[in-house]
Amino acid sequence: MDIDKLREEIKYDEGSVNKIYLDHLGLPTFGIGHLVLESDPEHGWEVGTDVSEDRCIEAFNSDIENVLSDCHRLYPDFDDLPEEVQRIVANMMFNMGRPRLSKFKGMKRGVDAKDWNAAADEMVDSRWYRQVTKRADRLVERMRN
């Protein structure tokens, strides 16, 4: 998979903010959609506090590694999927995390069967789709093609 292309797509969807902000769920976040964890040095920082570009990149790199690891856990044949499907699944994994994406059982059945339309239909039939409609529309369209 072209990791640079994945990184560009996620950066486009997430945006990049070099300070602590609240995401659409009201959770502290910084950089390229990095949810502040208790283990992060930024934990407890006030909204609006600046975060260095280097730290934002470091967090994004770590997040991408975790996303790809989670993709392989959820889809053991992840490397054998078409690259476009790999990037779609990875984008969704970045956005939702493995606990939520693992609940997309119909989508997983579609991907496992290489039935891209069935997988796309299951993507649409979700709360995630209603929450991030523009992003979801792009990913669904790509899955269908």
What are these regions (language model features)?
Residues 1-19, 25-26, 34-36, 51, ...:
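Long, amphipathic alpha-helical surface segments
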Residues 18-21, 73-84, 122:
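Surface-exposed patches in mature extracellular/periplasmic domains of secreted proteins
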Residues 30:
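Conserved functional hotspot residues at active sites or interaction interfaces
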Residues 43-75, 83-90, 94-101:
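Alpha-helical segment that forms one wall of the substrate-binding/catalytic cleft
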